[in-house]
Amino acid sequence: MENQFEHFVGFQWDQGNIDKNLVRHDVENWGSEQVFFNRPLLVLNDTKHSIPEKRWVAFGKTDADRLLTVIFTKRGDLIRVISARDVNRKERKFYNEEG
């Protein structure tokens, strides 16, 4: 899968999301960001949740090899993380087969 998000310049954190992933899923913001720098990184269009803005789902690993699902949108050259959590069983299988 081609990664169209390799040329972003940084991340944008919404005040409402800054601590949400840590509280709900025990995922630090820096862990969410690491997913985009490590390979393999699988990115799919999230057509089910792309209204009103286009969203994507990324499957990738942190530097500590924690496999995460990251829901995000793109704002210019920035990635805005909406949600990050551990992958579920189905997502882990997909990542292992496609990555």
Model feature map: region roles:
Residues 1-99:
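Ribonuclease/tRNase effector modules and their secretory precursors
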